[in-house]
């Protein structure tokens, strides 16, 4: 089992798919990594030898920001927006959509489960 960037790659999957189990690597980037290391993307992860695993590890660690470092960069970016109190930071703080979507009827995913207001119908009358 190949271990790259602190993640065990699934053995039975093709390399291009197995690499996507690393946070920060999608299909396009996985193919790019395979092309840089001259390893066939269709090769199974269990069939990789130590040289190939070391090549992959070296390319990923030197050229790409993945896993914990990427997560912390994203968190710091959001924290910076909240600290400078810009519009996007305020929306992050309130847990609302950032990019101009309507919130009167939609945005349930971002806002969370509905919170019922007691006696709302009585107040409307």
Swiss-Prot record:
List GO molecular-function terms, semicolon-separated: rRNA binding; structural constituent of ribosome; tRNA binding
SUPFAM superfamilies named among the record's database cross-references? S13-like H2TH domain
- Keyword annotations from UniProtKB, A to Z: Ribonucleoprotein, Ribosomal protein, RNA-binding, rRNA-binding, tRNA-binding
Q: Where are the transmembrane segments?
A: none
- Biological-process GO terms, alphabetical: translation
GO cellular component annotations, sorted alphabetically?
A: cytosol; small ribosomal subunit
Q: Which stretches does the entry tag as region Disordered?
A: 99-125
InterPro entries from the xrefs?
Answer: Rbsml_uS13_C, Ribosomal_uS13, Ribosomal_uS13-like_H2TH, Ribosomal_uS13_bac-type, Ribosomal_uS13_CS
Q: How does it assemble?
A: Part of the 30S ribosomal subunit. Forms a loose heterodimer with protein S19. Forms two bridges to the 50S subunit in the 70S ribosome.
Q: Which family does it belong to?
A: Belongs to the universal ribosomal protein uS13 family.
Describe the task this protein carries out: Located at the top of the head of the 30S subunit, it contacts several helices of the 16S rRNA. In the 70S ribosome it contacts the 23S rRNA (bridge B1a) and protein L5 of the 50S subunit (bridge B1b), connecting the 2 subunits; these bridges are implicated in subunit movement. Contacts the tRNAs in the A and P-sites.
- State the name under which the record lists this protein: Small ribosomal subunit protein uS13
- Say which species the protein is native to: Borrelia turicatae (strain 91E135)
């Amino acid at each position: 089992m190949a271990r790259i960037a602190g993640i065990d790659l699934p053995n039975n999957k093709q390399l291009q798919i197995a690499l996507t189990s690393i946070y920060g690597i999608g299909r396009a980037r996985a193919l790019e990594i395979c092309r840089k290391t001259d390893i066939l993307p269709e090769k199974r992860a269990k069939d990789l030898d130590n040289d190939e695993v070391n090549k992959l590890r070296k390319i990923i660690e030197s050229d790409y920001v993945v896993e914990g470092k990427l997560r912390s960069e994203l968190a710091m970016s959001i924290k910076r927006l909240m600290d400078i109190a810009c519009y996007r930071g305020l929306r992050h703080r309130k847990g609302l959509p950032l990019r101009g979507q309507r919130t009167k009827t939609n945005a349930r995913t971002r806002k969370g489960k509905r919170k019922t207001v007691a006696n709302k119908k009585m107040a409307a009358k």
